[in-house]
């Protein structure tokens, strides 16, 4: 069975505004410091529609014309592995500014990128010659540095992300590893199929803030929650 949720135009408008805010916040290191441009490139590591994450590039496209690698219309017809390989090859040619995915998926993609650059299945010379000059130089410098430090090539050696976002319930398990791989700490988002995007971290990367216009929130105390677990017939007061 597929879990679905009706999204009205007003819900989509709110969602668009909030994901755009997340994009901007993901680049910030302090209040008032942001860095987003329409020429930025975004690695596509999201499940396509009908999954909720498939809305992200479509909604963002209504606000800013950021290029996804690979293009959304092509990515939706590819397997996970095919998207990774093509996205990486395109990123080497065009550079990369943003990355967003579920925590575990982002980790898998990151390891995949590392294996593609470190293993025998890396970029061929013919493909390398299609890359921008600064990317070729960056790759050569990265390989020299990694050989000197006796370590594998990591995504952070090739790409200097402006923003990195993760969502999902398992982010705590991967955020430190993802930071080590990319050299930037991912900003966590909280979202679901029914309410869409509900909260985000900010430049501190410590704690999340609710989007007040996404849903009508109700809260119960931890004490009442535990009481409800013990006695399902108990109806806790909400705030």
Language-model regions, residue ranges each:
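Short, solvent-exposed loop/edge-beta patches enriched in aromatic
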Residues: 1, 27-31, 92-95
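Conserved AMP-binding A3 loop
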Residues: 1-17
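Short, conserved acidic/polar surface loops in the N-terminal third of protein domains
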Residues: 2-3, 53-56, 110-112
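Short, surface-exposed helix-loop/turn micro-motifs enriched in polar/charged residues
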Residues: 3-7, 33-34, 187, 209
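Short, well-ordered alpha-helical packing segments
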Residues: 12, 16-24, 43, 88, ...
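Conserved AMP-binding loop of ANL adenylate-forming enzymes
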Residues: 19-69, 73-78
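Active-site glycine/GP-rich loop and adjacent strand/helix microenvironment
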Residues: 59-239
């Amino acid at each position: 069975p597929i879990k679905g949720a009706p999204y009205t135009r007003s819900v989509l408008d709110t969602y668009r505004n909030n994901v755009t805010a997340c994009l901007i916040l993901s680049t910030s290191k302090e209040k008032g410091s942001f860095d987003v441009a329409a020429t930025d490139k975004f690695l596509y590591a999201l499940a396509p529609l009908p999954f909720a994450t498939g809305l992200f590039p479509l909604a963002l496209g209504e606000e800013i014309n950021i290029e996804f690698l690979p293009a959304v219309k092509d990515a939706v017809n590819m397997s996970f592995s095919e998207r990774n390989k093509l996205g990486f090859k395109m990123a080497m040619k065009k550079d990369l500014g943003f990355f967003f995915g579920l925590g575990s998926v982002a980790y898998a993609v990151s390891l995949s990128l590392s294996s593609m650059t470190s293993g025998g299945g890396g970029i061929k010379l013919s493909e390398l010659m299609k890359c921008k000059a600064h990317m070729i130089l960056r790759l050569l410098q990265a390989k020299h540095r990694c050989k000197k430090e006796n370590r594998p090539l990591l995504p952070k050696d090739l790409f200097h992300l402006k923003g990195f976002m993760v969502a999902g319930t398992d982010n705590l398990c991967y955020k430190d590893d993802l930071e080590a791989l990319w050299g930037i700490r991912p900003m966590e988002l909280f979202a679901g199929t029914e309410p869409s995007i509900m909260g985000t971290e900010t430049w501190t990367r410590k704690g999340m803030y609710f989007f007040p216009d996404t849903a009508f929130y109700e809260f119960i105390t931890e004490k009442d929650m535990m009481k409800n677990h013990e006695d399902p017939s108990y109806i806790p007061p909400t705030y």
